[in-house]
């Protein structure tokens, strides 16, 4: 229900080796469930924004150079994950007129787009309740992910794939760090 970003949380943990040595190994689906709660919370923050909040000047000021992107990826991720994540992160990186055009289009389409998204996305609490109902983990600590690591995964998950998700929209807007801080 959340644009693939939930899988990126799971993939991050799997690439780090989390739960792979358990008996039985930690289920991919359990990790995706926790990632889905996280991504639905991010979506909830995004959907609370107004078109006027999409500040082109702020977004342009927040654009990182390719060297900064590479440095951040390498600082955040394990060595075996770095090269591919650098390629993915640089592929998604947007700047200049392309970024301005993307934000202006988002501003123009936002009222209609936001209503369509609200109609199909679940609130994080609803996802938690459904996971509880079926006996699946519904909190990161239930899969041995502490709160600090969970927070860090919000940033790592954006780096590891080239698919464009809500995580990347918020990076493009220059507000992803603020959104994550509000969630924690």
Regions found by a protein language model. Give the residues of each.
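A conserved active-site cap/scaffold subdomain adjacent to cofactor or substrate pockets
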Residues: 1-48
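C-terminal charged capping/lid subdomain of soluble metabolic enzymes
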Residues: 49-184
């Amino acid at each position: 229900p959340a644009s693939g970003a939930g899988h990126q949380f799971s993939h991050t943990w799997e690439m780090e080796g989390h739960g792979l040595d358990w008996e039985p190994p930690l289920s991919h689906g359990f990790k995706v469930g926790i990632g889905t709660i996280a991504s639905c919370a991010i979506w909830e923050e995004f959907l609370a924004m107004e078109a006027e909040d999409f500040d082109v000047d702020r977004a342009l000021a927040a654009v990182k150079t390719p060297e900064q992107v590479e440095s951040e990826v390498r600082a955040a991720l394990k060595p075996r994950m770095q090269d591919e994540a650098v390629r993915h992160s640089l592929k998604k990186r947007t700047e200049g007129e392309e970024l301005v055009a993307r934000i202006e289009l988002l501003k123009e389409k936002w009222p209609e787009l936001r209503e369509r998204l609200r109609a199909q996305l679940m609130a994080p609490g609803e996802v938690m309740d459904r996971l509880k109902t079926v006996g699946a983990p519904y909190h990161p600590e239930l899969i041995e992910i502490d709160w600090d690591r969970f927070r860090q995964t919000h940033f790592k998950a954006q780096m590891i794939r080239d698919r464009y998700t809500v995580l990347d929209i918020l990076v493009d807007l220059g507000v992803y760090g603020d959104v994550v801080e509000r969630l924690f």
